[in-house]
Protein backbone atom coordinates (compact mmCIF):
# COMPACT_ATOMS: atom_id res chain seq x y z
CA UNK A 1 0.00 0.00 0.00
CA UNK A 2 3.02 2.23 0.26
CA UNK A 3 3.41 5.22 -2.02
CA UNK A 4 6.79 6.87 -1.51
CA UNK A 5 7.14 10.64 -1.55
CA UNK A 6 10.35 12.48 -2.30
CA UNK A 7 11.53 14.67 0.54
CA UNK A 8 11.50 17.77 -1.69
CA UNK A 9 7.90 17.28 -2.73
CA UNK A 10 5.34 19.82 -1.71
CA UNK A 11 2.94 17.93 0.54
CA UNK A 12 -0.66 19.06 0.85
CA UNK A 13 -3.54 17.83 2.98
CA UNK A 14 -7.11 18.70 2.04
CA UNK A 15 -9.75 18.62 4.78
CA UNK A 16 -13.29 20.05 4.77
CA UNK A 17 -12.26 23.10 6.79
CA UNK A 18 -8.50 23.32 6.24
CA UNK A 19 -5.63 23.10 3.78
CA UNK A 20 -2.33 21.81 5.19
CA UNK A 21 0.84 22.68 3.28
CA UNK A 22 4.33 21.52 4.16
CA UNK A 23 6.50 24.39 5.38
CA UNK A 24 3.54 26.76 5.73
CA UNK A 25 0.77 27.63 8.14
CA UNK A 26 -2.56 25.87 7.95
CA UNK A 27 -5.06 27.64 5.69
CA UNK A 28 -8.52 27.84 7.25
CA UNK A 29 -11.37 27.33 4.79
CA UNK A 30 -14.52 29.28 5.59
CA UNK A 31 -18.03 28.72 4.34
CA UNK A 32 -17.64 25.05 3.51
CA UNK A 33 -20.50 22.56 3.69
CA UNK A 34 -18.34 19.54 4.52
CA UNK A 35 -17.77 18.66 0.87
CA UNK A 36 -14.51 18.94 -1.04
CA UNK A 37 -15.62 21.97 -3.06
CA UNK A 38 -14.56 24.76 -0.67
CA UNK A 39 -11.04 23.50 0.14
CA UNK A 40 -10.31 22.61 -3.47
CA UNK A 41 -11.44 26.02 -4.73
CA UNK A 42 -9.28 27.70 -2.06
CA UNK A 43 -6.27 25.72 -3.22
CA UNK A 44 -5.31 27.96 -6.16
CA UNK A 45 -4.52 30.90 -3.90
CA UNK A 46 -2.65 28.65 -1.47
CA UNK A 47 -0.40 27.40 -4.29
CA UNK A 48 0.58 30.87 -5.52
CA UNK A 49 4.32 31.21 -5.99
CA UNK A 50 5.05 27.50 -5.56
CA UNK A 51 6.62 25.22 -8.15
CA UNK A 52 7.93 21.68 -8.47
CA UNK A 53 5.83 18.63 -7.74
CA UNK A 54 3.25 17.87 -5.09
CA UNK A 55 1.56 14.98 -3.32
CA UNK A 56 -1.97 15.45 -2.01
CA UNK A 57 -3.66 13.67 0.89
CA UNK A 58 -7.46 13.71 0.94
CA UNK A 59 -9.51 13.70 4.13
CA UNK A 60 -11.31 10.41 4.67
CA UNK A 61 -14.54 12.39 4.50
CA UNK A 62 -13.96 12.66 0.74
CA UNK A 63 -13.29 8.93 0.29
CA UNK A 64 -15.37 5.74 0.35
CA UNK A 65 -13.64 2.55 1.42
CA UNK A 66 -14.33 -1.13 1.01
CA UNK A 67 -12.25 -4.19 1.84
CA UNK A 68 -12.20 -6.93 -0.79
CA UNK A 69 -11.37 -10.44 0.40
CA UNK A 70 -8.30 -11.95 -1.25
CA UNK A 71 -9.25 -14.00 -4.30
CA UNK A 72 -6.56 -16.00 -6.09
CA UNK A 73 -8.64 -16.12 -9.28
CA UNK A 74 -8.23 -12.37 -9.75
CA UNK A 75 -4.91 -11.84 -11.50
CA UNK A 76 -4.93 -8.31 -12.91
CA UNK A 77 -5.62 -4.78 -11.63
CA UNK A 78 -8.51 -4.58 -14.09
CA UNK A 79 -10.17 -7.62 -12.52
CA UNK A 80 -9.79 -6.19 -9.02
CA UNK A 81 -11.14 -2.81 -10.17
CA UNK A 82 -14.15 -4.53 -11.74
CA UNK A 83 -14.86 -6.29 -8.44
CA UNK A 84 -14.47 -3.01 -6.56
CA UNK A 85 -16.89 -1.23 -8.90
CA UNK A 86 -19.41 -4.04 -8.41
CA UNK A 87 -19.03 -3.75 -4.63
CA UNK A 88 -19.49 0.02 -4.64
CA UNK A 89 -22.48 -0.29 -6.98
CA UNK A 90 -24.03 -2.75 -4.54
CA UNK A 91 -23.39 -0.47 -1.57
CA UNK A 92 -24.09 2.94 -3.09
CA UNK A 93 -26.03 2.45 -6.30
CA UNK A 94 -25.51 4.03 -9.75
CA UNK A 95 -23.61 7.06 -8.42
CA UNK A 96 -20.58 4.78 -8.04
CA UNK A 97 -20.15 5.11 -11.81
CA UNK A 98 -19.08 8.72 -11.17
CA UNK A 99 -16.23 7.73 -8.86
CA UNK A 100 -12.59 7.05 -9.56
CA UNK A 101 -11.77 3.72 -7.95
CA UNK A 102 -8.36 2.37 -7.03
CA UNK A 103 -7.50 -0.95 -5.40
CA UNK A 104 -4.33 -1.52 -3.44
CA UNK A 105 -2.80 -4.51 -1.69
CA UNK A 106 -2.59 -4.52 2.11
CA UNK A 107 -0.44 -7.68 2.28
CA UNK A 108 0.43 -10.46 -0.21
CA UNK A 109 -2.52 -12.70 0.72
CA UNK A 110 -4.55 -10.13 2.59
CA UNK A 111 -7.66 -8.21 1.56
CA UNK A 112 -7.44 -5.48 -1.04
CA UNK A 113 -8.40 -1.96 -0.03
CA UNK A 114 -10.72 -0.30 -2.53
CA UNK A 115 -10.87 3.51 -2.40
CA UNK A 116 -13.41 5.58 -4.32
CA UNK A 117 -13.23 9.35 -4.86
CA UNK A 118 -15.49 11.66 -6.84
CA UNK A 119 -14.03 11.83 -10.34
CA UNK A 120 -14.74 15.60 -10.59
CA UNK A 121 -12.54 16.10 -7.52
CA UNK A 122 -9.58 14.41 -9.21
CA UNK A 123 -10.21 16.28 -12.45
CA UNK A 124 -10.44 19.63 -10.63
CA UNK A 125 -7.19 18.97 -8.77
CA UNK A 126 -5.46 18.16 -12.06
CA UNK A 127 -6.70 21.43 -13.57
CA UNK A 128 -5.61 23.52 -10.57
CA UNK A 129 -2.12 22.05 -10.37
CA UNK A 130 -1.60 22.36 -14.13
CA UNK A 131 -2.59 26.03 -13.99
CA UNK A 132 -0.19 26.56 -11.07
CA UNK A 133 2.68 24.94 -12.97
CA UNK A 134 3.04 22.20 -10.36
CA UNK A 135 3.26 18.51 -11.24
CA UNK A 136 0.67 16.53 -9.28
CA UNK A 137 2.59 13.36 -8.46
CA UNK A 138 0.01 11.54 -6.34
CA UNK A 139 -3.35 11.76 -4.60
CA UNK A 140 -3.83 9.54 -1.58
CA UNK A 141 -6.56 9.06 1.07
CA UNK A 142 -5.61 10.04 4.61
CA UNK A 143 -6.15 6.56 6.05
CA UNK A 144 -3.75 5.07 3.52
CA UNK A 145 -1.15 7.78 4.11
CA UNK A 146 -1.42 7.39 7.88
CA UNK A 147 -1.08 3.61 7.71
CA UNK A 148 1.98 3.84 5.49
CA UNK A 149 3.54 6.09 8.11
CA UNK A 150 2.85 3.74 11.05
CA UNK A 151 2.85 0.32 9.41
CA UNK A 152 6.27 -0.63 10.82
CA UNK A 153 5.03 -0.03 14.36
CA UNK A 154 1.94 -2.15 13.66
CA UNK A 155 3.79 -5.00 11.97
CA UNK A 156 1.92 -8.27 12.44
CA UNK A 157 0.17 -6.97 15.53
CA UNK A 158 -3.40 -5.88 16.17
CA UNK A 159 -4.79 -2.39 16.68
CA UNK A 160 -7.56 0.06 16.01
CA UNK A 161 -6.71 3.14 13.95
CA UNK A 162 -9.01 6.03 14.83
CA UNK A 163 -8.98 9.08 12.53
CA UNK A 164 -10.65 12.28 13.73
CA UNK A 165 -12.14 14.68 11.19
CA UNK A 166 -14.78 17.39 11.68
CA UNK A 167 -17.92 15.67 12.93
CA UNK A 168 -16.78 12.14 12.19
CA UNK A 169 -14.44 9.29 12.99
CA UNK A 170 -12.96 6.67 10.68
CA UNK A 171 -12.28 3.38 12.47
CA UNK A 172 -9.99 0.76 10.96
CA UNK A 173 -9.33 -2.61 12.60
CA UNK A 174 -6.14 -4.55 11.97
CA UNK A 175 -5.68 -8.04 13.45
CA UNK A 176 -2.39 -9.90 13.24
CA UNK A 177 -1.29 -7.54 10.51
CA UNK A 178 -4.43 -8.08 8.40
CA UNK A 179 -7.07 -5.46 7.64
CA UNK A 180 -10.42 -6.62 9.03
CA UNK A 181 -12.82 -3.68 8.84
CA UNK A 182 -13.17 0.03 8.03
CA UNK A 183 -16.13 2.00 9.30
CA UNK A 184 -17.05 5.66 9.35
CA UNK A 185 -19.35 7.18 11.94
CA UNK A 186 -20.52 10.56 13.13
CA UNK A 187 -18.93 11.94 16.28
CA UNK A 188 -19.44 14.98 18.46
CA UNK A 189 -16.78 16.85 20.41
CA UNK A 190 -17.13 14.50 23.37
CA UNK A 191 -16.00 11.39 21.51
CA UNK A 192 -12.74 11.17 23.47
CA UNK A 193 -14.71 10.48 26.64
CA UNK A 194 -16.55 7.51 25.16
CA UNK A 195 -13.97 6.04 22.78
CA UNK A 196 -13.73 2.69 24.63
CA UNK A 197 -17.51 2.31 24.45
CA UNK A 198 -17.43 3.14 20.73
CA UNK A 199 -14.77 0.50 20.07
CA UNK A 200 -16.50 -2.07 22.27
CA UNK A 201 -19.70 -1.64 20.25
CA UNK A 202 -17.76 -1.97 17.00
CA UNK A 203 -16.05 -5.10 18.35
CA UNK A 204 -19.42 -6.62 19.26
CA UNK A 205 -20.78 -5.78 15.80
CA UNK A 206 -17.79 -7.53 14.21
CA UNK A 207 -18.11 -10.52 16.55
CA UNK A 208 -14.50 -10.39 17.75
CA UNK A 209 -13.57 -13.37 19.92
CA UNK A 210 -10.72 -11.44 21.54
CA UNK A 211 -10.75 -7.69 22.21
CA UNK A 212 -8.24 -5.46 20.45
CA UNK A 213 -7.12 -2.90 23.02
CA UNK A 214 -4.28 -1.12 21.25
CA UNK A 215 -5.53 2.15 19.76
CA UNK A 216 -3.66 4.57 17.50
CA UNK A 217 -5.50 7.88 17.42
CA UNK A 218 -4.90 10.37 14.60
CA UNK A 219 -6.30 13.43 16.31
CA UNK A 220 -6.91 16.97 15.08
CA UNK A 221 -6.53 18.33 18.59
CA UNK A 222 -4.88 17.26 21.80
CA UNK A 223 -5.42 13.68 22.93
CA UNK A 224 -4.24 13.01 26.48
CA UNK A 225 -3.07 9.39 26.35
CA UNK A 226 -1.96 9.39 29.99
CA UNK A 227 -5.36 10.56 31.20
CA UNK A 228 -7.06 8.06 28.91
CA UNK A 229 -4.91 5.18 30.23
CA UNK A 230 -5.62 6.18 33.82
CA UNK A 231 -9.34 6.00 33.16
CA UNK A 232 -9.21 2.82 31.08
CA UNK A 233 -6.33 0.64 32.23
CA UNK A 234 -7.02 -2.14 29.74
CA UNK A 235 -6.44 0.12 26.75
CA UNK A 236 -3.04 1.01 25.30
CA UNK A 237 -3.39 4.28 23.44
CA UNK A 238 -1.02 6.23 21.18
CA UNK A 239 -1.80 9.64 19.71
CA UNK A 240 -0.47 11.18 16.50
CA UNK A 241 -1.24 14.57 15.00
CA UNK A 242 -3.54 14.61 11.99
CA UNK A 243 -1.70 17.47 10.30
CA UNK A 244 1.71 15.89 10.88
CA UNK A 245 0.58 12.59 9.39
CA UNK A 246 -1.01 14.28 6.39
CA UNK A 247 2.27 16.05 5.59
CA UNK A 248 4.73 13.32 6.59
CA UNK A 249 7.13 11.91 4.03
CA UNK A 250 7.80 8.18 4.14
Label every PLM stretch briefly:
Residues 1-250:
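Hydrophobic/aromatic-enriched cytosolic interaction surfaces used to assemble or bind macromolecules
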Amino acid sequence: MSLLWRNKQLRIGLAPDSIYISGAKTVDVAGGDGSWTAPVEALSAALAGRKGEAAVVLADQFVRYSLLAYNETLKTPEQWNALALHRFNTLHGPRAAEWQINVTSTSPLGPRLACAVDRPLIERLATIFTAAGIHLASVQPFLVAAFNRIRKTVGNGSCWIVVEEPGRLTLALIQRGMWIAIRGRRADKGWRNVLPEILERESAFLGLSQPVTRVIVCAQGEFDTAHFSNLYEAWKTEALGYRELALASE
